[in-house]
C-alpha cells in the first residue's frame, strides 16, 4: 500500500472529507473515498494508483480499543468502477448496489484486556446518481460525488435506505456480505 492506512483512516474518522472525485494521477496516488463507523468499529475505503497506473480499491477495518484506533485487516480489488461516472437509478435498478464486501475477526485481546469475539463486516456500495446520502440504521452517511460508499456492522447487516437531496427515501438497499447466498444474510 502506497499510503499509511491507519493514519489516513483516522483522518477520515476525525472528520476529514472524502474526495469528491475519484481521479488518480502521477501526483495523486491515493484518495479517501468513504468511511462508516458503528460504535467501536469502522471501515474506510480508498482508491490508489497501483502498478502501471491501474486503479485499485482498498477497504480497511478498524477497531477502537482503549481510545485508540487500530487496523485489523481489509480487502482490495479492481478500482476502475470507482473512476467511472455514477449510474442513474433507472440503470442501476436500486438506490445502491452492494458490489463486494468482507469480514475481519475482531481483536482477541490479551490477558489484560477483555476478550472480544466476533467479526467486523463491511459492504462496498456503488450508489445511484440520484442518491445523496444513506441512512444506515440510525446513522446518516453522506455520499460523495463519485458514488462510492462503505457500510460496516458487527452483528446483522444494517437496514440501509437511499435518500435524495431533500432527505426523502428513494428506496431500500440490499446488503450482500462476502460469502452470502442471500441478500442480507451472512454465511
Q: What would you call each of these model-derived segments?
A:
Residues 29-32, 45-49, 113-118, 127-132:
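Short loop/turn and low-complexity linker motifs enriched in small/turn-promoting residues
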Amino acid at each position: 500500500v502506497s499510503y499509511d492506512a491507519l493514519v489516513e483512516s483516522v483522518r477520515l474518522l476525525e472528520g476529514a472529507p472524502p474526495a469528491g472525485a475519484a481521479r488518480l494521477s502521477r501526483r495523486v496516488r491515493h484518495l479517501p473515498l468513504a468511511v462508516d463507523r458503528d460504535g467501536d468499529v469502522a471501515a474506510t475505503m480508498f482508491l490508489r494508483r497501483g502498478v502501471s497506473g491501474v486503479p485499485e480499491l482498498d477497504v480497511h477495518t478498524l477497531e477502537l480499543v482503549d481510545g485508540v484506533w487500530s487496523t485489523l485487516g481489509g480487502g482490495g480489488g479492481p478500482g476502475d468502477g470507482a473512476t467511472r461516472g455514477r449510474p442513474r437509478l433507472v440503470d442501476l435498478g436500486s438506490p445502491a448496489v452492494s458490489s463486494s464486501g468482507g469480514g475481519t475477526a475482531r481483536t482477541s485481546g490479551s490477558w489484560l484486556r477483555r476478550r472480544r469475539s466476533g467479526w467486523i463486516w463491511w459492504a462496498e456500495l456503488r450508489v445511484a446518481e440520484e442518491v445523496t446520502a444513506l441512512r444506515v440504521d440510525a446513522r446518516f452517511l453522506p455520499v460523495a460525488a463519485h458514488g462510492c460508499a462503505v457500510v460496516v456492522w458487527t452483528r446483522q447487516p444494517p437496514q440501509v435506505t437511499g435518500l435524495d437531496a431533500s432527505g426523502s427515501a428513494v428506496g431500500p438497499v440490499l446488503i450482500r456480505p462476502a460469502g452470502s447466498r442471500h441478500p442480507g444474510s451472512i454465511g
